[in-house]
Amino acid sequence: PSLHWAGERIAPTICYEDLFTEELAARFANEAQAPTIFANLSNIAWFGDSVAIDQHLHISQMRALEFERPFLRATNTGATAIIDHRGNVVQQLPSAQRAVLTGEVTGHQQRTPYARWMAVTGLWPLAAWALVVLGLALWQHRRGKLRCATS
């Protein structure tokens, strides 16, 4: 469920929950209750100084773009940022420094076609399509082997 604050519906995510687009999309099933802002809280200290910190920021940028929602990120070691609804990092704190990030964020109400689609179907149609393509590829491969064997 979303948190209601200052006229916005803020959907909290913890750590890598923003990796799972279906989890976030489920929050858009009821348009009247759909979040207007995402907020991610993460303890990413155990990643150290690795690519995972930037990767997690990029995942949040992608989710902001997919759902056209601003994304607020608060972390303990790096990648604390404000991301706009287009996936652009508007503000970011330096990594591994204690600081406070402030800024203004306005939520968005409209659901993207992606959000509407994912809220209803999830990734199942894509998975089914991938299985059909894989099946056709295997069928073609076996058919080619049979031709070689009969030649």
Regions from the PLM with identified roles:
Residues 1-151:
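Solvent-exposed soluble domains appended to multi-pass membrane proteins
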